[in-house]
Amino acid sequence: MRLHFLPLVALCATTASSLAFDSSTSQPPGAQVYSVNDAAGLKRIGAHHPKYHDRRTVTIRSSHNDTDDVSADFLWGIRRANHGGRLLLKKGQKYVIGRKLDLSFLDNVEVQLDGELKFTDDVPYWQENNFYYDFQKSISFWRWGGHDVRIFGRGTLNGNGQRWYNEFAGQEILDPDNTYYRPILFVAENATRLSVEGITELNSPCWTNFLVNSKDISFDNVFINAYSTNASAEPKNTDGFDSLNVNGLSVTNTRVDIGDDCFSPKPNTTNIFVQNLWCNNTHGVSMGSIGQYPGVLDIIEHAYIENVTLLNGENGARLKAWAGEDVGYGRINNITYKNIHVENTDYPIVLDQCYFNIPADECASYPSQVNVTNIVFENVYGTSSGAEGNVVAELICSPNAICEDIKLKGINLTTPEGEKGVVVCDGISGGVGVECQSSE
């Protein structure tokens, strides 16, 4: 199966919305442009920083309320700031985005987000007007792309997800019959040297960040949160970080409080660096899932993950690969987890090669074809939740895959009662470096 990444233009009701957002040579009402030499003006509006060089700075009007769409103003502003400038979204101001935006043209531009960028929750509009990706039927409000893009500030990118949570309750993203597609909060596609620093990402309808066909992407000091005001409709699939075909992905000094994967690079992500990551109520720091699509080679390799805290979750350090009748193949290689602190976590360490929820008999009949090699779990410590009894690590290799050079070093994991945890492993060539019990 060959994956394509094309806008879902076939579902657009008309072309009117895209025409409305063509850039204009006329300056919209309320917009201002400040010269790089106007130090007093830049300081007055909050665009002068010791950490960053001054730039030509553009401001746009803010929204009067949650239905006052400033998409056209935003597009004008970022075009005006492109090629060496900065778009400032001011502290204490709200900027509502109600139309899809193609921001794939960026070159040497900064966006200083000190206010709030908030998407409308017009579900019918977004389900017909979006950017679509074949991979797990993903859609997005917008897409960012280009070279040398920096997004920074102390503001909030708000996905306004509550309506999406309510209407998706009881459904599953990987259900083949699912047609209720939910937008990803931030997508970078065909981007090189894009960084996100300091902002909060709030209540994404689906995944929070999705990086596609990109190189040298970094996130630093970001806070990601997803919560629901409806106890019967919790956020689902709000992963912190997902990636596809990315070389060079860095996440540092970041806090994630959501209900799904904290960090989970997907197929063909290489050269990964994670440091000082805090995850609460998540499915862990996962490599994968990979091997989902028939005949497709997937790779995740060269990852270094250090100083991670994982609280109150299903998994800690996890490797996951698909099994089943019509799946792909690949490898997870050269992955290091070091200094990983877990508390109240069901599976602190896990290799899952029967993903996604594949019944045991089907997994046995159609095992995963993803090789897992050169993996180190070092200084993983803390407590399990007790959900799996005294098992704190489970590493079970597919009979159709190679699993070798997988080592556990300095593991200190206990049950909630303080008893030493048990490591379960099967099919690992050469052992794992600690005492290990068979799953049978």
Swiss-Prot record:
Q: Choose one Gene Ontology CC annotation of this protein and give it.
A: extracellular region
Reaction(s) the record says it catalyses: [(1->4)-alpha-D-galacturonosyl](n) + H2O = alpha-D-galacturonate + [(1->4)-alpha-D-galacturonosyl](n-1)
Give its localization: Secreted
Disulphide-bonded residues = C262-C279, C397-C403
Signal peptide span: 1-20
Enumerate the InterPro entries for this protein.
Glyco_hydro_28, Pectin_lyas_fold, Pectin_lyase_fold/virulence
Which parts pass through the membrane? none
Alphabetical GO biological process terms: cell wall organization; pectin catabolic process
Alphabetically list the UniProt keywords.
Answer: Cell wall biogenesis/degradation, Disulfide bond, Glycoprotein, Glycosidase, Hydrolase, Repeat, Secreted, Signal
EC number(s) from the headed UniProt entry: 3.2.1.67
Q: Record's SUPFAM superfamilies?
A: Pectin lyase-like (SSF51126)
Name the principal localization, coarsely classed: secreted
Glycosylation: which residues? N65, N190, N230, N268, N280, N307, N334, N371, N412
GO MF term list: galacturan 1,4-alpha-galacturonidase activity; polygalacturonase activity
Q: Where is the active site?
A: D260, H283
State the family named in the UniProt similarity comment for this chain. Answer: Belongs to the glycosyl hydrolase 28 family.
State the protein's purpose: Specific in hydrolyzing the terminal glycosidic bond of polygalacturonic acid and oligogalacturonates.
Among PANTHER family, the record links this protein to: EXOPOLYGALACTURONASE B-RELATED, PTHR31736
The name of this protein is: Probable exopolygalacturonase B
Q: Which organism is it from?
A: Emericella nidulans (strain FGSC A4 / ATCC 38163 / CBS 112.46 / NRRL 194 / M139)
